[in-house]
Regions:
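Ankyrin repeat domain, specifically the short helix-to-loop turn at the C-terminus of the second helix
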Residues: 1-7, 12-13, 39-48, 92-102, ...
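Conserved ankyrin/ankyrin-like repeat signature
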Residues: 36-37, 88-92, 141-145, 189-190
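Leucine-rich solenoid repeat scaffolds
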Residues: 146-197
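Long, low-complexity, intrinsically disordered N-terminal extensions of eukaryotic proteins, enriched
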Residues: 2-6, 19-23, 27-31, 181-199
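Short coil/linker segments at helix-helix boundaries
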Residues: 79-90, 127-143
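Ankyrin-repeat boundary/"N-cap" motif
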Residues: 9-28, 51-80, 106-132, 159-177
Length: 199
């Protein structure tokens, strides 16, 4: 790889229906949590803002910049109580931003990095019975990631104003309630975190 810099940004385009079609080695390494390989690839010219080409990936696939993959990794690791792994993903988010990843680049379904972090945290926080042991660390992780994204230029206003649910994120998360079983507002946990952060 060190002799062929282009290799770190090449993508698999084979005909077999594999998940890595259209992904760069960096993207695959991030999804697999191979942090030494990630470091090596970035040091050798891998694109920290790489995103799959929608024309190459299987139909109906969501294409996303590698920054989003790292954000997902930080929360997915928590679901398996892999706390050190989750911390490594947070550090990777910082590294990707330092290398030039765009903190405002959307997925092919228009999700901003802030939105990806909020969505991932909300998934856990709204399922307290399924994830009782990671509620507090999920809140902490969300704030850490938001801090990094905003430090490197993420546009809070763009996310708040974005009409993603038929209403703005501001209305969806701060004003609307969503009642689950036992008439409990399952959106309240994420709302409390976001109100403390955005207000």
């Amino acid at each position: 790889i060190s002799k062929n810099i282009k290799a770190v940004n090449e993508v698999y385009t084979g005909k077999a229906p594999k998940k890595d079609i259209g992904q760069s080695p960096l993207q695959v390494a991030i999804k697999c949590g191979e942090f030494e390989i990630i470091e090596f690839l970035l040091e050798n010219g891998a694109d920290p803002d790489f995103m799959e080409n929608p024309e190459v990936v299987p139909p109906h696939s969501v294409c996303m910049p590698v920054l989003h993959d790292a954000i997902i990794g930080a929360f997915s690791a928590l679901c398996y109580k892999q706390y050190m792994q989750s911390e490594k993903y947070v550090n990777l988010i910082k590294i990707l931003l330092e290398y030039g990843a765009n903190p405002n680049r959307k997925t092919s379904s228009e999700i901003l990095p802030i939105g990806m972090a909020v969505n991932q945290a909300d998934f856990i926080l709204s399922r307290k019975s399924a994830y009782p042991d990671i509620q507090e660390i999920t809140q902490k992780r969300l704030l850490e990631i938001l801090d990094l994204l905003i430090e490197y230029g993420a546009d809070k206003k763009e996310w708040l104003d974005q009409d993603f649910w038929g209403v703005s994120n501001k209305v969806h998360y701060f004003e609307e309630k969503q009642y689950g079983t036992n008439n409990i507002d399952i959106r309240e946990p994420i709302r409390i975190v976001l109100e403390g952060y955005f207000h």
